[in-house]
């Protein structure tokens, strides 16, 4: 059986270097390119890569995906900063490259994806729900893509169930005191030295609370999801948003 030819973009970063090691250790994969800042994208096509694992920055991701899709290279994307406008551009590129797949995953940790699913299931059964994400102080975006996605899934579940808005009598507050509002769900971001990536979903009802928490303690926690994404994206054309779609959770 031939091995899946994988390239890593952002290979010199903390997660990227971990991804390089994970691909090299995978028996069914071959690392054909490991590109860092300043390396030319032409190496992707020259290497014969079937899949590119994109772990760069919001400033670079669109150019990288444009190149991949013009050359029929599938992509597994962990870079954040996705807006409706960017997703529309990406879908237009995919329309011009039928058969090519792109997975965008707000989080590659299997545990984090399960946390989102658990919160989505529980949300309609509680009056109140808020999300708290905690990360290292070098993280450039807030709230995290995982927290935003979690809040969106919670809001969808509550809307489908016909849940009433969460009670909140706050009349005055300092800017940001109640967090960011993501589809009606408060999301709070903490940046603290010593942390890596953590999230809590707090749910409350009369006489009880439920906390759903996940902690990533090392970048290695993201590798099983990255490898799963690389294996599945080659047979999943078009855009897939969220690793949960590759986990058969339904």
UniProtKB/Swiss-Prot annotation:
Q: In UniProt terms, what function does this protein have?
A: Catalyzes the conversion of 4-hydroxy-tetrahydrodipicolinate (HTPA) to tetrahydrodipicolinate.
Name the UniProt record assigns to this protein = 4-hydroxy-tetrahydrodipicolinate reductase
Q: Is-annotated flag, keyword Amino-acid biosynthesis?
A: yes
Species, as recorded: Streptomyces coelicolor (strain ATCC BAA-471 / A3(2) / M145)
Q: State its Enzyme Commission number(s).
A: 1.17.1.8
Entry annotation: catalytic residues: 135, 139
Positions bound to NAD(+): 10-15, 78-80, 105-108
Database matches in PROSITE patterns? DAPB
Location (main, coarse): cytoplasm
- Listed GO cellular component terms? cytosol
Q: GO MF terms on file?
A: 4-hydroxy-tetrahydrodipicolinate reductase; NAD binding; NADP binding; oxidoreductase activity, acting on CH or CH2 groups, NAD or NADP as acceptor
Residues reported in the UniProt entry to bind (S)-2,3,4,5-tetrahydrodipicolinate: 136, 145-146
Family annotation (HAMAP family): DapB
- Give the NCBIfam families listed for this entry: dapB
Query: What InterPro entries does this protein's entry cite?
Result: DapB_C (IPR022663), DapB_N (IPR000846), DapB_N_CS (IPR022664), DHDPR_bac (IPR023940), NAD(P)-bd_dom_sf (IPR036291)
Tell me the Gene Ontology biological-process terms attached to this UniProt entry.
Answer: diaminopimelate biosynthetic process; lysine biosynthetic process via diaminopimelate
User: Keywords assigned by UniProt?
Assistant: Amino-acid biosynthesis, Cytoplasm, Diaminopimelate biosynthesis, Lysine biosynthesis, NAD, NADP, Oxidoreductase
């Amino acid at each position: 059986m031939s091995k899946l030819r994988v390239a890593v973009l952002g290979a010199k970063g903390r997660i990227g270097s971990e991804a390089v090691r994970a691909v090299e250790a995978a028996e069914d994969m071959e690392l054909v390119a490991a590109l860092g800042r300043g390396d030319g994208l032409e190496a992707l096509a020259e290497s014969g890569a079937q899949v590119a694992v994109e772990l760069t920055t919001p400033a670079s991701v669109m150019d990288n995906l444009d190149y991949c899709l013009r050359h029929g290279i599938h992509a597994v994307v962990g870079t954040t900063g996705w807006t409706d406008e960017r997703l529309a551009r990406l879908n237009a590129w995919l329309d011009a490259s039928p058969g090519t797949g792109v997975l965008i995953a707000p989080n590659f940790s299997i545990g984090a994806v399960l946390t989102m699913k658990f919160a989505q299931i529980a949300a309609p059964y509680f009056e109140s729900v808020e999300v708290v994400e905690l990360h290292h102080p070098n993280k450039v975006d807030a709230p995290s893509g995982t927290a935003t996605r979690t809040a969106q899934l919670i809001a969808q579940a509550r809307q489908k169930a016909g849940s009433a808005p969460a009670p909140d009598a706050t009349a005055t507050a300092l800017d940001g005191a109640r967090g960011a509002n993501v589809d009606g769900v408060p999301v709070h971001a903490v940046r603290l030295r010593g942390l890596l990536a953590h999230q809590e979903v707090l749910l409350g009802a009369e006489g009880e609370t439920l906390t759903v928490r996940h902690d990533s303690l090392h970048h290695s926690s993201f590798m099983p999801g990255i490898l799963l994404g690389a294996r599945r994206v080659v047979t999943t054309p078009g855009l897939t948003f969220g690793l949960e779609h590759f986990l058969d959770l339904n």
